[in-house]
Design a protein with these regions (language model features):
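RNase H-like DDE/DDD metal-dependent nuclease/strand-transfer catalytic core used by mobile genetic elements
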Residues: 1-12, 18-132, 136
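C-terminal domain-tail junction helix/linker
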Residues: 82-84, 106-189
Length: 189
């Protein structure tokens, strides 16, 4: 994010649901695998758990805070514990993560450009409070023109999609499975 007088260097971790555009942001004074995992642990996973929807896959850039050897990289370990598949953007191709990049531009225009003109921040916590206030508005009151939003808020889109996903899941569960079990060989085919 940049250097803020009185606070120092600030880094932003961002999560954007690519279907609904629901976004979550947390600010940090460093950029590490631990802080990347903290956003998921503190905000993202609890949100999805509350909605009773599993987070199956995540797309990140190729930054060192997200990528490393799975057996000793904090972010990779966290994804493994949570059973989340990890996809990475193409190298030197920010457009691969265009939804997140577009969100950053919106946040810069609608949040940071305004709040930094109104107030001088002396702590990361104060800044996070104002960022969270803007995020609530973005997610819950600001209509979005995204592919699946059709002028609804990201949260309305998420809740609508939750119902659709539930219906699809029910139909796949109620179909007769095509499984035969051979007791002699103990194999599933």
């Amino acid at each position: 994010m940049g250097n803020i007088k009185g606070i120092g260097r600030i880094y932003q971790q961002t999560f954007v649901d690519t279907y609904s555009r629901v976004a979550m942001v947390k600010l940090y004074t460093d950029r590490t695998a631990i802080t990347a995992a903290d956003l998921l642990n503190d905000r993202v996973i609890p949100f999805f758990d509350e909605q009773k929807i599993p987070l199956l896959r995540i797309l990140t850039d190729r930054g060192t805070e997200y990528c490393g050897k799975p057996e000793n990289h904090a972010y990779q370990l966290y994804l493994g514990i949570e059973n989340i598949d990890h996809s990475r953007t193409k190298a030197n191709s920010p457009q691969t993560n265009g939804i997140c990049e577009r969100f950053h531009r919106t946040m810069q225009d609608e949040c940071y450009n305004i709040i930094f003109r109104k107030k001088i921040y002396s702590s990361l916590e104060d800044l996070q409070i104002d960022v969270d206030h803007w995020l609530r508005s973005y997610n819950e009151t600001r209509p979005h023109s995204g592919k699946y939003c059709y002028g609804k808020t990201p949260m309305q889109t998420f809740l609508d999609s939750k119902y659709i996903a539930f219906q699809k899941n029910i139909s796949s569960i109620t179909q007769e499975p095509d499984i035969s079990f051979d007791y002699l060989n103990s194999s599933v085919s």
